[in-house]
């Protein structure tokens, strides 16, 4: 016997003119929670990946376009947290080692990407993250080369895995080799991807190591600007015009503005903190663009590339530092 009762339609709601399912609200709730300090960058990426794998990501929203805009805003905001005088001073410390390690990593990464037959943009993002400052570099370079969310997610996942490992093994290696505070701080700043892991590893080693690592890491992070422009040039394809990442220009302007208008320091600090949280939201959105099926399709090549680059820069910089840095 068939029932004459009408079937219950799923609850829906409107968002910017789009008809969304009530189940999609979980996606927005977690996105908002990413603004709180209780969720770290790796956790945000994993949450996005988990929702995507279980089909809880709204399909009617252009999440990729929103992510690109939010990434630009967050990178610009981070510029207000960098002091120009500190940036200039940091650039003079270990300049040769910083420049050499960055370009070695990018060039070696290019050859390895070719050898492994890995997607060019994914390989370049992993190399950029290894060469400069992990997730922040990947977030800045990705829109400059018009990388897809799955390419960005694979690069971020690779870097975050290696970051977690570095946090534990670097201090152990430093103590085993009886490295000085200054030498270890230099090594951590050169060979560890993300600033958070650099600070964590160096802080565990000692106060002097932390000061050295923070200063050199800042100088390394400043290379986000030229590398983003270089990346846009390399991946312009058949287009005659280069896709200039204008947010990088505003990032530089934010640094300069904060320097010449110091009276607004309290506001800058709030903008900087808010931008860091917005970056976490972006990582959640990026994670929502990749599923288990996409990871299986990519295979182990992205992780293998990340490990090979990391070992090369880690061993190479360690050898140089042990021979030349007191």
Swiss-Prot record:
Family: Belongs to the UPF0324 family.
CC annotations in GO: plasma membrane
Classification via InterPro entries: UPF0324_pro
Transmembrane segments annotated in the record for this chain: 27-49, 70-89, 94-116, 123-145, 155-177, 184-206, 216-235, 242-261, 271-290, 303-325
Subcellular location: Cell membrane
Protein name in the entry: UPF0324 membrane protein PBPRB0970
Principal location: membrane
Alphabetized UniProt keyword annotations: Cell membrane, Membrane, Transmembrane, Transmembrane helix
Membrane topology qualifier: Multi-pass membrane protein
PANTHER family in alphabetical order: INNER MEMBRANE PROTEIN YEIH-RELATED (PTHR30106), UPF0324 MEMBRANE PROTEIN FN0533 (PTHR30106:SF1)
């Amino acid at each position: 016997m068939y029932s004459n009762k009408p079937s219950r339609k799923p609850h829906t709601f409107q968002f910017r003119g789009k008809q969304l399912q009530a189940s999609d609200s979980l996606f927005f709730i977690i996105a908002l929670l990413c603004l709180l300090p209780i969720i770290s960058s790796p956790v945000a990426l994993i949450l996005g990946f988990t929702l995507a794998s279980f089909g809880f990501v709204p399909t009617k929203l252009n999440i990729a376009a929103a992510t690109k805009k939010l990434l630009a805003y967050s990178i610009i905001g981070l510029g207000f947290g960098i002091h120009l005088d500190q940036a200039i001073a940091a650039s003079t410390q270990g300049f040769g080692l910083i420049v050499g390690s960055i370009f070695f990593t990018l060039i070696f990464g290019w050859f390895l990407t070719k050898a492994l037959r890995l997607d060019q943009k994914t390989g370049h993002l992993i190399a950029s993250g290894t060469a400069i400052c992990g997730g922040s570099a990947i977030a800045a370079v990705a829109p400059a080369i018009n990388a897809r969310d799955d390419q960005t997610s694979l690069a971020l996942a690779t870097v975050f895995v290696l970051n977690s490992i570095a946090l534990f093994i670097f201090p152990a290696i430093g103590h085993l080799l009886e490295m000085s505070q200054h030498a270890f701080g230099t090594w951590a700043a050169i060979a560890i991807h993300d600033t958070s892991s650099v600070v964590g590893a160096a802080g565990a080693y000692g106060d002097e190591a932390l000061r050295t690592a923070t200063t050199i890491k800042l100088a390394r992070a400043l290379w986000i600007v030229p590398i983003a422009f270089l990346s846009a040039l390399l991946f312009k394809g058949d287009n005659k015009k280069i896709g200039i990442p204008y947010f990088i220009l505003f990032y530089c302007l934010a640094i300069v503005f904060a320097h010449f208008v110091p009276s607004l320091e309290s506001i800058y600090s709030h903008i900087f903190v808010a931008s860091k949280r917005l970056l976490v939201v972006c990582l959640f959105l990026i994670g929502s663009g990749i599923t288990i099926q996409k990871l299986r399709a990519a295979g182990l090549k992205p992780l293998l590339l990340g490990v090979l680059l990391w070992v090369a820069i880690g061993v190479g910089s360690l050898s140089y530092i042990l021979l030349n840095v007191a």
